[in-house]
UniProtKB/Swiss-Prot annotation:
This is ATP-dependent Clp protease adapter protein ClpS. It comes from the Bacteria. Binds to the N-terminal domain of the chaperone ClpA. GO terms for biological process: protein catabolic process; proteolysis. Involved in the modulation of the specificity of the ClpAP-mediated ATP-dependent protein degradation. Transmembrane segments: none annotated. It comes from Edwardsiella ictaluri (strain 93-146).
C-alpha cells in the first residue's frame, strides 16, 4: 500500500506551476531625443548624472543624439525606466532646457 505522504506530495507540482507562471519583466529603452536648443554640455551632464557614464561614454552618446536624432541611454524594467524619464525631463525643465527623454519597449 502507498504511503499517505506519497499521495499528498504536491511539492513538485507546485514548483512546476511556479516556474511556468513567473516570466522575466518587460524591458524598456530610455531614449534621449535631439533638439536645436539644449547645449551639448547639458546632455553630457544628464548622461553622467542619471546613468553614471564616464565623460568619454557620455560624449559618445551625446554625439549620437546630436547626429542621429536620438540615442538609447540604457535598458531597464518599466518602473526604473519610467522613473529615469520623469527625473530627466523634470531636471531639463528645471534648468530651462527642452531636452526630451522618452521610453520604448526594448
Amino acid at each position: 500500500m502507498a504511503n499517505l505522504n506519497d499521495w499528498l506530495n504536491l511539492e513538485p507540482l507546485a514548483e512546476d506551476q511556479t516556474r511556468r507562471a513567473v516570466k522575466p519583466p518587460s524591458l524598456y529603452s530610455v531614449i534621449l531625443n535631439n533638439d536645436d536648443y539644449t547645449p551639448m554640455e547639458f546632455v553630457i551632464e544628464v548622461l553622467q548624472t542619471f546613468f553614471a557614464y564616464d565623460i568619454e561614454r557620455a560624449t559618445q552618446l551625446m554625439l549620437t543624439v546630436h547626429y542621429k536624432g536620438k540615442a538609447v541611454c540604457g535598458v531597464f524594467t518599466a518602473e526604473v525606466a519610467e522613473t529615469k524619464v520623469a527625473l530627466i525631463n523634470r531636471y531639463a525643465r528645471d534648468n530651462e532646457h527642452p531636452l526630451l527623454c522618452t521610453l520604448e519597449k526594448a
